[in-house]
Amino acid sequence: MLKIGPYEFQSRLLLGTGKYPDLEVQKQAVEVSGAEILTFAVRRMNIFEPNQPNFLENLDLTKYKLLPNTAGAKTAEEAVRIARLAKASGLCDMIKVEVIGCEKTLLPDPVETLKATEILLEEGFIVLPYTSDDVVLAKRLQELGCHAVMPGASPIGSGQGIVNPLNLSLIIEQATVPVIVDAGIGSPADAAFAMELGADGVLLNTAVSGAADPVKMAKAMKLAVEAGRLGYEAGRIPKKRYATASSPMEGMSVV
């Protein structure tokens, strides 16, 4: 069970809703993914323009918890303004804080992320900040009182997978709130690996929406997250330098 603030979820896969070929493919992918939390960029939504089409009209919103994000914000002030706009729409009380500090890498600005997180927590938001794999920054965000931390596996949309498993492991080890690996996931193997490291969840978008068959990939990601979590809970065997026979010679009959 994934617990974020007062909410509990069966699925540990969080799915982004952008860049799908069309709304029907998006709907099918969302459904087969089993995801219960859907994220979207507030700036790309027509939440106050009912005559304009948006993906919300295509989904049964009783099945999902919406997680708007502040994509496009470059300062804490912009992120806070976007978050307030999302809350005013009446659709949600959770917010993914995303303050980009570099246009080329789309890596988050740590200082502005901390500022925005602190303000939004004071205003009563359920805050999930997108951050780098900086161990100390993740700790600071946690100490502020955020409801989850979302370290990136690698740059957004890069598909590079987990480039620094050590840092992610350290973030997970020190965490007292859920750790949701966000950004850079490119394949089911990446998602499974994140879960095997002990992450509480995985958020991805491009890996599904950009796949040759987004619906099949959504199902693959669902199974990968489940398998990775089971593997983590089961406990992998330790790595050793030399072989150990699975059928020891002791006790064997002489043929």
From Swiss-Prot:
UniProt pathway: Cofactor biosynthesis; thiamine diphosphate biosynthesis
Catalytic residues (positions): K96
Protein name in UniProt: Thiazole synthase
Source species taxonomy: Bacteria, Bacillati, Bacillota, Bacilli, Bacillales
Assembly description: Homotetramer. Forms heterodimers with either ThiH or ThiS.
One Gene Ontology biological process: thiamine diphosphate biosynthetic process
Keywords per UniProt: Cytoplasm, Schiff base, Thiamine biosynthesis, Transferase
Family designation: Belongs to the ThiG family.
Record field: catalytic activity: [ThiS sulfur-carrier protein]-C-terminal-Gly-aminoethanethioate + 2-iminoacetate + 1-deoxy-D-xylulose 5-phosphate = [ThiS sulfur-carrier protein]-C-terminal Gly-Gly + 2-[(2R,5Z)-2-carboxy-4-methylthiazol-5(2H)-ylidene]ethyl phosphate + 2 H2O + H(+)
HAMAP family: ThiG
Binding site for 1-deoxy-D-xylulose 5-phosphate: G157, A183, G184, N205, T206
Subcellular location per the Swiss-Prot or TrEMBL entry: Cytoplasm
